[in-house]
C-alpha cells in the first residue's frame, strides 16, 4: 500500500475516535472510542516500521505490546463500568457523581 493512504486512514480513525471520546456521554462508547484511537496509533506504528526499516520489527513488537495493554485497559474499564451500572443503574458519564460523595 501507499504510505499516504494508510496515514490518511489512520488519521481518520484517530479523529473519529477523538470526536467520539469528546462527545460521548456513555461510558461504554467512550471506551470503544479510546480503543479506536489506540488502533489508529497501532496502524501508524506498523506502517512506519514497515516503510522505514523492514529488517527490524520494532514497530510490530511495540504494536503487540500496545494491544496487550489495551486489552487489559478494556477489561478493567468494563469491570468499572459494570460496577457503576450495578450501583447507579446508569452508564451515562454525566450522571456518575462518584467524586461528590
Curated annotation (Swiss-Prot):
Coiled-coil features, chain-numbered ranges: none
Membrane spanning stretches: 2-22, 32-52, 61-81
Entry's Gene Ontology molecular function annotations: oxidoreductase activity, acting on NAD(P)H, quinone or similar compound as acceptor; quinone binding
Catalyses which reaction(s): a plastoquinone + NADH + (n+1) H(+)(in) = a plastoquinol + NAD(+) + n H(+)(out); a plastoquinone + NADPH + (n+1) H(+)(in) = a plastoquinol + NADP(+) + n H(+)(out)
Membrane topology: Multi-pass membrane protein
Record has Iron as a keyword: no
Cysteines joined through disulfide linkages: none
Compartmental location: Plastid, Chloroplast thylakoid membrane
Primary residence: plastid
Keyword Iron: no
Assigned keywords, A-Z: Chloroplast, Membrane, NAD, NADP, Plastid, Plastoquinone, Quinone, Thylakoid, Translocase, Transmembrane, Transmembrane helix, Transport
Source taxon at top rank: Eukaryota
EC number(s) on file: 7.1.1.-
Enzyme class, first EC level, given as a word: translocase
InterPro entries, per the entry: NADH_UbQ_OxRdtase_chain4L/K (IPR001133), NUOK/Mnh_C1-like (IPR039428)
A Pfam cross-reference name: Oxidored_q2
GO biological process annotation, one example: photosynthesis, light reaction
GO CC annotations on file: chloroplast thylakoid membrane; NADH dehydrogenase complex
Subunit structure: NDH is composed of at least 16 different subunits, 5 of which are encoded in the nucleus.
Its biological purpose: NDH shuttles electrons from NAD(P)H:plastoquinone, via FMN and iron-sulfur (Fe-S) centers, to quinones in the photosynthetic chain and possibly in a chloroplast respiratory chain. The immediate electron acceptor for the enzyme in this species is believed to be plastoquinone. Couples the redox reaction to proton translocation, and thus conserves the redox energy in a proton gradient.
Family statement: Belongs to the complex I subunit 4L family.
UniProt name for this protein: NAD(P)H-quinone oxidoreductase subunit 4L, chloroplastic
Annotated organism of origin: Draba nemorosa
Taxonomy of the source species: Eukaryota, Viridiplantae, Streptophyta, Embryophyta, Tracheophyta
Gene that encodes the chain: ndhE
Amino acid at each position: 500500500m501507499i504510505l499516504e493512504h494508510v496515514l490518511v486512514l489512520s488519521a481518520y480513525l484517530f479523529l473519529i475516535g477523538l470526536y467520539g471520546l469528546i462527545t460521548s456521554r456513555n461510558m461504554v462508547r467512550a471506551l470503544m472510542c479510546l480503543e479506536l484511537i489506540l488502533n489508529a496509533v497501532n496502524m501508524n506504528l506498523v506502517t512506519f516500521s514497515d516503510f522505514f526499516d523492514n529488517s527490524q520489527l520494532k514497530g510490530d513488537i511495540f504494536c503487540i505490546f500496545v494491544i496487550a495493554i489495551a486489552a487489559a485497559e478494556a477489561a478493567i474499564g468494563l469491570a468499572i463500568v459494570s460496577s457503576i451500572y450495578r450501583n447507579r443503574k446508569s452508564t451515562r458519564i454525566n450522571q456518575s457523581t462518584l467524586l461528590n460523595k
